[in-house]
């Protein structure tokens, strides 16, 4: 009996967006595999300081996104890396999958041109290179600088003009993300309060308590500004100025906040 072809798409999916699922659909439609497993990584060894949503939140969002694809029965979310030792390394995941499912599945890997360029730095890269077909999709402004005999470059793969980082920033700013995220994923994010402006303030406050920089105070001040908390915003901009006397951005934001605050409390009928 022939083995089923399973393509693995690894990612933090913080959060999962339409670009991710478009790649999975493309792989199915091109006949590159029978199924796609979107493997949610608990920790990327190259991004250990990256602030991640919880494992289960990210898995739940991927599960919702997979159900919204054109092939929900063939595109799945996977928690396999949650079961393994952290930080997660691709070679460990591949060996686990081979031991448990290798008798019925043949695995391949889907990754961006930015990732394959770092492949020689991965743990036991030689074993990955020798043992698996690797399909590479183009990433903006990232040339393919490394390939193997088992590498296939997918020049016609769908390209995405935004990243999860941009999605998070837009969510924290209250901007529209409907072009970027599936509706059910957006609903989940809102219900769970993920990447809200209040959450950003909490994270910035924690960073400031560990050792403040002018940039941290400016970013938190901008959050307070968007919440119309002018006094707190001004305090943060002043602290940024104290930390960096040449910080033009802090001065500009402080003056703008002070002008708004002065106008709000000015008696326009008795100037």
Q: Where do the PLM segments sit?
A:
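Short coil turns that delineate tetratricopeptide repeat
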Residues: 211-212, 245
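Alpha-helical linker/edge segments of TPR/alpha-solenoid repeat scaffolds
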Residues: 197, 256-271
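Conserved structural position within tetratricopeptide repeats
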Residues: 206-209, 241-242
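Nucleotidyltransferase catalytic core that binds NTPs
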Residues: 1-200
């Amino acid at each position: 009996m022939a083995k089923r072809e399973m393509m693995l798409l690894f990612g933090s999916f913080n959060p999962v967006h339409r670009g991710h699922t478009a790649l999975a659909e493309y792989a199915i439609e091109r006949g590159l595999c029978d199924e796609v497993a979107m493997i949610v990584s608990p920790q990327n060894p190259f991004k250990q300081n990256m602030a991640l949503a919880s494992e289960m939140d990210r898995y739940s969002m991927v599960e919702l996104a997979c159900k919204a694809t054109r092939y929900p029965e063939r595109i799945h979310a996977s928690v396999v890396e949650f079961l393994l030792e952290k930080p997660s390394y691709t070679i460990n995941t591949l060996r686990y999958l081979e031991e448990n499912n290798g008798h019925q599945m043949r695995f391949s890997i889907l990754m961006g041109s930015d990732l394959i360029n770092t492949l020689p730095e991965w743990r036991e890269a030689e074993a990955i290179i020798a043992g698996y077909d690797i399909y590479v999709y183009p990433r903006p402004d990232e040339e393919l600088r490394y390939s193997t005999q088992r590498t296939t470059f997918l020049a016609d793969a769908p390209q995405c003009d935004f990243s999860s980082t941009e999605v998070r920033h837009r969510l924290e700013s209250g901007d529209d993300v409907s072009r970027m995220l599936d509706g059910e994923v957006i609903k989940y994010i809102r219900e769970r309060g993920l990447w809200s402006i209040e959450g950003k303030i909490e994270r910035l406050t924690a960073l400031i308590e560990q050792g403040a920089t002018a940039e941290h105070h400016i970013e938190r001040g901008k959050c307070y500004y968007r919440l119309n908390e002018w006094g707190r915003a001004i305090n943060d901009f002043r602290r940024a100025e104290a930390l960096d006397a040449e910080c033009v951005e802090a001065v500009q934001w402080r003056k703008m906040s002070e002008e708004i605050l002065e106008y709000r409390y000015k008696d326009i009928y008795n100037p």
